[in-house]
Design a protein with these regions (language model features):
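Blade-level signature of beta-propeller repeat domains, shared across WD40, Kelch, NHL, RCC1
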Residues: 297-343
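Hydrophobic loop/turn residues within beta-sheet-rich immunoglobulin-like superfamily modules
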Residues: 53, 105, 158, 192, ...
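Conserved core positions of repeat-based scaffolds
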Residues: 1, 49-52, 61, 101-104, ...
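Short glycine/serine- and acidic-residue-enriched loop/turn motifs that recur at repeat junctions
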Residues: 3-27, 63-83, 115-134, 167-187, ...
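C-terminal outer-membrane/trafficking sorting elements
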Residues: 350-358, 362-427
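Short coil/turn segments that connect the beta-strands within blades of beta-propeller domains
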Residues: 48, 57, 100, 109, ...
Length: 427
């Protein structure tokens, strides 16, 4: 990790103190985060916090805890926890946040939230007058959910039935077109049933459909919606992009990897986070360079991505060294990150281990087996959307795929031997 460490969010056991000359205010190069041999399979960062899900599904958190956003009971500490600390005994599939409200999904599909509740964004039926914050994860819904996200004061999620929901602050119609300004419980957004993923910006959201189209709604502050309109929208998602392989939403900018692996972006660009060499906002989707990309992440005012060849690049705001380039200068162009192997490196992804998926042409169920102990299995469709997930603790498991549409799917496993990918066809 790299960047600002004023609340201990780098997880290196330190935090910034202006009274200490040898402080740890920031890190201008990427450094590893370690926790007693724990293997992490995913990580997410908010402004002041970091969260990681281990290979066994356990959730770890560190950083500021002023509103209980670490989920660790105690509150009121700006620089709260300096190293990864286990939150609870639950098994987590998804955890996301942007500021001081966190939402997550257990492996059983139930939806949870904790942290700040200024506009009812926890979704537990209470506003800030009755519940200012939740210091431990609270259940939002017993139903099964696929994905979730939180903005500054609103939250949004996708149910297992493909419906889209939102709640919290509605001052910019980031929930729906109602005149109500606050919703303390989830409200359905439209009637479509083909939503698969969702992410939230400060006052807007972007959701992906099964056909690979990306839709946005809420405030168009700083051109975040990807279309030339001013102010807030009518609360109805509108299509912003087609043929999406993956995408990421920052503060008010959006990055998309298209199905041809090209990178596109739009929105806020004051700090060069769209890498077009300028500081002007971009109203509509615009291609960024000509390289091909495998993954990208939009931060608050900066961006990081990995190209097809495995090289890591960063650009945008760099006041705290978050670009990992060894300095604190902003970049308005793509800038390659050089890793020092002694300080941490990108983990190798294994693609040739003895992981097998059978039958290779399936109708009801597939079986995944390996010589190593598998910790998790994810299923992705041809557009790169995750359509299935299961925690595992063994060398073999079965997954029901009867609900999937016909087509080609990829099975990604995490095991003691590393990461592997196999393919099967749903008949």
């Amino acid at each position: 990790m790299s960047g600002n460490n004023d609340a201990g969010q780098l997880g290196d056991g330190h935090y910034f103190d202006s009274e200490i000359s040898d402080n740890h205010y920031n890190a201008t190069t990427f450094k590893p985060v370690e926790k007693d041999g724990v293997k992490f399979r995913s990580v997410t960062a908010t402004i002041y916090n970091s969260y990681a899900i281990a290979s066994d599904g356990a959730l770890y958190a560190w950083g500021q805890n002023a509103y209980g956003q670490l989920g660790l009971v105690s509150v009121g500490t700006y620089s709260g926890i300096y190293t990864p600390t286990k939150v609870d005994d639950a098994k987590w599939a998804v955890v996301k946040g942007r500021s001081t409200t966190i939402v997550g999904i257990h492996t059983d599909g139930t939806l949870w939230a904790w942290g700040k509740n200024l506009h009812g964004q926890l979704g537990v039926g209470a506003d800030s007058e009755t519940k200012e914050c939740a210091t431990t994860p609270e259940k939002v819904s017993d139903e099964r959910w696929l994905d979730c996200a939180s903005g500054f004061y609103h939250s949004t999620a996708v149910k297992a039935d493909g419906t889209l929901w939102a709640w919290g602050d509605n001052s910019q119609n980031q929930v729906n077109s109602s005149t109500a300004t606050i919703f303390t419980t989830p409200q359905q957004v439209g009637e479509d049933t083909d939503w698969t993923q969702v992410q939230a910006g400060v006052k807007m959201s972007a959701a992906l459909k099964a056909d690979g189209s990306l839709w946005t709604w809420g405030s168009n502050e700083e051109s975040a919606l990807g279309r030339a309109v001013e102010g807030k929208t009518d609360g109805k998602p509108m299509k912003a992009f087609d043929k999406v392989l993956s995408y990421s939403v920052g503060d008010n900018h959006v990055l998309v990897i298209k199905d041809d692996y090209t990178l596109w972006g739009w929105g806020y660009n004051l700090h060069g986070q769209l890498a077009d060499g300028t500081n002007r906002n971009i109203d509509t989707p615009t291609q960024i360079g000509t390289a091909q990309w495998q993954t990208v992440a939009a931060g608050f005012y900066h961006s990081v991505g990995v190209q097809i060849d495995g090289s890591v690049w960063s650009w945008g705001f760099n006041r705290y060294g978050q670009l990992g380039l060894g300095d604190d200068n902003n970049r308005a162009e793509l800038s390659k990150v050089d890793f020092n192997p002694e300080e941490g490196a990108v983990a190798e992804i294994t693609t040739d281990s003895a992981v097998k998926v059978y039958p290779t042409v399936a109708e009801e169920t597939i079986t995944v087996s390996s010589d190593a102990t598998i910790s998790s299995v994810s299923i992705y469709n041809a557009n790169g959307q995750k359509v299935g997930f299961k925690m595992v603790d063994g060398t073999q498991t079965s997954l029901n795929v009867s609900h999937l549409a016909a087509g080609t799917y990829f099975v990604a496993t995490e095991s003691d031997a590393g990461k592997s990918v196999a393919r099967f066809i749903k008949k």
